[in-house]
């Protein structure tokens, strides 16, 4: 029995999940702090891959990142890297498709966080980084874990965009 497809799927899902773990937390944290109007516009843009069929997302990525398109040609010329039909393009497409799951779940956890805990830390003279990693993240760990599991499961089953 050939196990290569399973290992390939696991590898792509794992790498995409690691990328999305940090990108999703970063985006959710900063967008949760924005004014309501800007937050709404960014929400629509960032969750678009969730509502579009995977084949449409894959087609759009091909149209944007193809070697004869502006972005694809620039990356090919500047770095010598082809952005389509490679192993890394599968990781990129999977990352684009799973991003909304991580982002929305973590943003919900950040918005449910009691800000008085962060304010208390500030009055005690704690740095923002310390407050984020030692107060906010432990309080939001269930949302972060849920988003990570959802993203990994979606990445493992992704076929259409890649």
Regions found by a protein language model. Give the residues of each.
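Short helix-to-coil transition segments within interhelical loops
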Residues: 113, 119-140
């Amino acid at each position: 029995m050939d196990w290569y497809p399973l290992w390939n799927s696991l590898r792509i899902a794992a790498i995409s999940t690691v990328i999305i773990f940090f990108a999703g937390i970063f985006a959710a944290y900063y967008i949760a702090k924005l004014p309501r109007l800007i937050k709404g516009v960014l929400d629509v843009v960032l969750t678009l891959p969730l509502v579009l069929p995977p084949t449409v997302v894959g087609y759009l990525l091909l149209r944007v990142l193809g070697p004869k398109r502006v972005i694809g040609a620039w990356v090919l010329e500047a770095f010598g890297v082809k952005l389509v039909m490679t192993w890394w393009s599968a990781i990129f497409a999977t990352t684009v498709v799973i991003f909304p799951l991580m982002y929305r779940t973590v943003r919900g956890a950040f918005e449910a966080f009691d800000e008085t805990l962060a304010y208390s830390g500030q009055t005690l003279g704690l740095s923002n980084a310390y407050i984020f990693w030692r107060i906010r993240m432990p309080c939001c760990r269930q949302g972060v874990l849920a988003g990570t599991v959802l993203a990994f499961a979606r990445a493992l089953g992704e076929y259409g965009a890649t």
